[in-house]
Amino acid sequence: MADDAAPHADVLNSTAQGQLKSIIDRVERLEVEKTEIAEQIKEVYLEAKGNGFDVKILRKVVRLRKTDRAKRQEEDAILDLYLSAIGEI
């Protein structure tokens, strides 16, 4: 299998090979950072839970804050309309 890979390396010139290696290295570094950040976020939620906060609601607040206020208000109005239509509110 290794012998099959060697001829393909000749297809790319040395500049393209360097760029490809650089791109792959950067993606791999970012994947490591993403994993580390995800672990830090998890720790923050555990801390919040330890302080008595509802983590499910905190996650919802974070998600809602990412949404444009006008879009969120429109979605809330439609949700209220649907809930009202089925007698839930």
From Swiss-Prot:
Pfam families the UniProt entry points to: GapR_DNA-bd (PF10073)
Family annotation (InterPro entries): GapR-like, GapR-like_DNA-bd
Protein origin, superkingdom: Bacteria
Similarity field: Belongs to the UPF0335 family.
HAMAP family assigned: UPF0335 (MF_00797)
Stored NCBIfam families: PRK13694.1
Protein name: UPF0335 protein Caul_0876
Protein's organism: Caulobacter sp. (strain K31)
